[in-house]
Amino acid sequence: MLEKYLEISKEVSEALKENKPVVALESTIISHGMPYPKNAETALNVEKIIRDKGAIPATIAILNGKLKVGLTKDEIEYLGKKGKEVVKTSRRDIPFILAKKLDGATTVASTMIVANLAGIKVFGTGGIGGVHRGAQESFDISADLQELANTNVAVVCAGAKSILDIGLTLEYLETQGVPVVGFGTEELPAFYTRKSGFKVDYRVDTAKELAEALKAKWDLGLKGGMVVGNPIPEEYQMDYDTITKAINDAVKEAEEKGIKGKESTPFLLAKVKDITKGKSLEANIQLVYNNVAVASDLAIELSKLNK
């Protein structure tokens, strides 16, 4: 049944059969996260980092109505060039993108779904979605959070994107029973900065310790993922006050223009990039590189435990 929809590359398929470490990657970061050719270059560098670490990258996207797990260089270039013409696809969109045989860029939520269908348990990305500022009125809450509650995939990220309400995001995750872990930190990172002012549930200092906690969670049938907050490397983090002001200005502009829903995150990130004269984009790229390195280590440790 699944073969009709799911196409796993030979390399990824063989790695999974042999219990080799595999790291899932999303494609919204390629189509909506940055301009071409930077987006394709970054995606290929990310794959190289994972390979150098000793794991196998599995970039996930929907191409011509097929859920693809593991993309070729040409497919990554294609997504990079098409950019925002590709539909940003979350859980609710998958059935229609498949039925209409369209191209779709997977978000954190839909990447988790497809990774789980393929049997991949670790996913490295930039930041997760969350509760938007003002959600008390708008109810704008990313589907990523519900996915983390339901789907058994660990997500290594630099925290929640700082354009969000981090406090409310953590409250939501707590209600859903999703552990929020700091990798080498007591505090949840805030994407562009190492600190957010919010404590994590647990601090973990090694990938081995993380893998053991995940194995225990899933062995007990406690469904859902885990948020692994991995701070941006110090030399690339942005000045807290500068980035906070840039975000506040961007949020204000989005409100004035009535930008909401799935359009809001790409708009806010692009605005912050303009305000910071491109510095936020460089920070974004570096934090992704850092996250996939940790995700690779975690995938390696998990595969050892599952031998």
Curated annotation (Swiss-Prot):
Domain of life: Bacteria
Alphabetized GO MF terms: hydrolase activity, acting on glycosyl bonds; metal ion binding; pseudouridylate synthase activity
Entry binding sites for substrate: K88, V108, S142, A143, D144
Keyword hit for Transit peptide: no
Reaction(s) this enzyme catalyzes, per UniProt: D-ribose 5-phosphate + uracil = psi-UMP + H2O
Gene3D superfamilies registered for this protein in UniProt: Indigoidine synthase domain
Binding site for Mn(2+): D140
Annotated catalytic residues: E26, K161
An example Gene Ontology CC term for this record: cytoplasm
Range of residues in the leader sequence: none
Key words of the record: Glycosidase, Hydrolase, Lyase, Manganese, Metal-binding
Role of this protein: Catalyzes the reversible cleavage of pseudouridine 5'-phosphate (PsiMP) to ribose 5-phosphate and uracil. Functions biologically in the cleavage direction, as part of a pseudouridine degradation pathway.
Family recorded in the similarity comment: Belongs to the pseudouridine-5'-phosphate glycosidase family.
Self-association and partners: Homotrimer.
Protein name per UniProt: Pseudouridine-5'-phosphate glycosidase
Species whose genome carries this gene: Clostridium botulinum (strain Langeland / NCTC 10281 / Type F)
Lineage: Bacteria, Bacillati, Bacillota, Clostridia, Eubacteriales
Name of the gene this protein is made from: psuG
